[in-house]
């Protein structure tokens, strides 16, 4: 990875439901399984060895996917953020930032408040390290929405509102590129860049290089 110029590594999430990547005192008490390897420590050590920065992805309890309400994730992650910073962030210079791992595509219930609360806490505990989100675009390739793809105007209107509510604590947005058709990329990505510039955010791309032509 280093030899081809990769300088940043992002952990997509530190856990999903009962499976976690590090021995979290809080999550173990909540019934999560003890991991056989402390992957977070491993990733941070290797990132430091090769001069890379590692972005920590927050915990996903699965409650958002079950209920459609993102606000459930704040309660769990307020403990995860504090313990991860104390256990790893203070120890490793390779700890470079935070990935707010809740994935949305549109004006989801609780999204603005959740991203703002989590982004604010991440920055406060770490002395202002960068934060980012990686939503998808609700296009024709989206598994759950193939018949009701979002229009460009709807996408711009809804994300204008979301960015307005989070830009002070979220530094970058990396939209996933795999849910819209190839000939729609320029239009939607132009909107993304325009909105990011408007709110002083960085506009990244989550290049999804896997096929979507097989059942999940």
Please identify what each model-predicted range represents.
Residues 1-216:
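Glycan-processing catalytic domains of CAZymes
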């Amino acid at each position: 990875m280093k030899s081809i110029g990769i300088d940043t590594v992002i952990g997509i999430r530190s856990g999903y439901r009962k499976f976690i990547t590090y021995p979290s005192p809080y999550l173990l008490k909540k019934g999560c399984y003890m991991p056989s390897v402390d992957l977070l420590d491993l990733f941070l050590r290797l990132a430091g060895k090769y001069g890379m920065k590692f972005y920590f992805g927050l915990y996903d309890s699965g409650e958002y996917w079950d209920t459609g309400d993102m606000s459930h994730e704040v309660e769990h992650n307020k403990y995860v953020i504090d313990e991860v910073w104390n256990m790893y962030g203070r120890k490793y210079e390779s700890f470079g930032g935070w990935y707010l791992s809740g994935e949305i595509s549109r004006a989801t219930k609780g999204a603005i408040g959740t991203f703002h609360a989590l982004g604010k806490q991440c920055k406060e505990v770490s002395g202002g390290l960068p934060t980012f989100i990686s939503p998808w675009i609700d296009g024709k390739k989206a598994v759950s929405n193939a018949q009701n793809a979002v229009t460009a105007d709807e996408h711009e209107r809804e994300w204008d509102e979301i960015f307005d509510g989070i830009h002070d604590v979220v530094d970058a947005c990396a939209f996933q590129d795999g849910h819209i058709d190839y000939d729609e990329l320029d239009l939607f990505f132009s909107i993304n860049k325009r909105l990011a510039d408007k709110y002083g955010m960085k506009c990244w791309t989550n290049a999804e290089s896997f096929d979507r032509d097989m059942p999940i």
